[in-house]
A protein has these predicted regions:
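Recognition helices and adjacent regulatory flanks at domain boundaries
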Residues: 1-18, 52, 64, 85, ...
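Amphipathic alpha-helical dimerization/coiled-coil segments
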Residues: 2-7, 95-112
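A general structural signal marking secondary-structure boundaries and capping sites
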Residues: 43, 72, 108-112
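Short amphipathic alpha-helical/adjacent loop interface patches that line ligand
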Residues: 43, 53, 65, 94, ...
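Canonical helix-turn-helix DNA-binding module
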Residues: 46-84
Length: 112
């Protein structure tokens, strides 16, 4: 709510910050939770993630991994091998999502 002299000027709905909206911006992609779920079990390579999530295309997986890395949920480590080896690991920020995923799993078991 914004006050201007004696006039009330309501904030536009799109300018009101919402923590849920911010969270969904970080982890709300179609494949994000599945990638995060697999990384809870430990560091994975691209090919491992693709095998564990067979419905995701390589392009979608690459996009999801880049997005999660940009948002600080996971980190990417490149090893100078031939061919190049790349591993993905959850950051502490990503690990904090464990409780949320667990609750979503319980909700789905109850209601779907």
């Amino acid at each position: 709510m914004v006050m201007n002299a004696n006039n009330y000027i309501p904030k536009e709905p799109e300018t009101i910050e919402c923590n849920i909206e911010k969270t969904l911006d970080v982890i709300g992609g179609k494949w994000a939770f599945l990638v995060i779920r697999e990384l809870f079990c430990g560091t994975k390579r691209f090919g491992e993630l693709q095998r564990l999530i067979p419905a995701v295309s390589p392009r979608a997986l690459t996009s999801t991994l880049r997005h999660l890395e940009e948002k600080g949920v996971l980190e990417r480590q490149v090893f100078p091998t031939v061919p190049v080896t790349v591993e993905y690991t959850l950051t502490p920020k990503g690990e904090d999502l464990h409780a949320i995923l667990k609750q979503m799993k319980l909700w789905a078991a109850k209601w779907t």
